[in-house]
Amino acid sequence: MNGPALLKCICDETRFEILELLQKDNELCVNDYVEKLKKDQPLISHHLKTLKQCGIVKSREEGKKAMYSISNLQLSTLISTVTKTSNKIPTLCNDENSC
């Protein structure tokens, strides 16, 4: 996967929130995301499917649950770096629709 394709996969706000949680918690199931992100289960499942198709997350079965985790250490490091860097950049535009 090239850089722009990777960024396209993670640029959605919900997908990035999922990855931030995974970066901190290592492994979660769909219900964990629903509870922590306060978003509907079908939406979370859709975004996890997209992240899995991109190769960014992997899943394993644990009983009736699918447990999701970031697929490799470099991706976890990337998510951490993006989060830390974005927190240090001043907000230049308060209207995200016009930026």
Predicted region positions:
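Short, hydrophobic-biased segments on the C-terminal half of alpha helices
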Residues: 19, 48-49
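Beta-hairpin "wing" of winged helix-turn-helix
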Residues: 52-62, 69
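Amphipathic alpha-helical dimerization/coiled-coil segments
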Residues: 1-2, 24, 72-99
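Conserved alpha-helical interface elements of two-component signaling phosphotransfer modules
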Residues: 42
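N-terminal helix-turn-helix DNA-binding core of bacterial DNA-binding proteins
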Residues: 2-39, 65-74
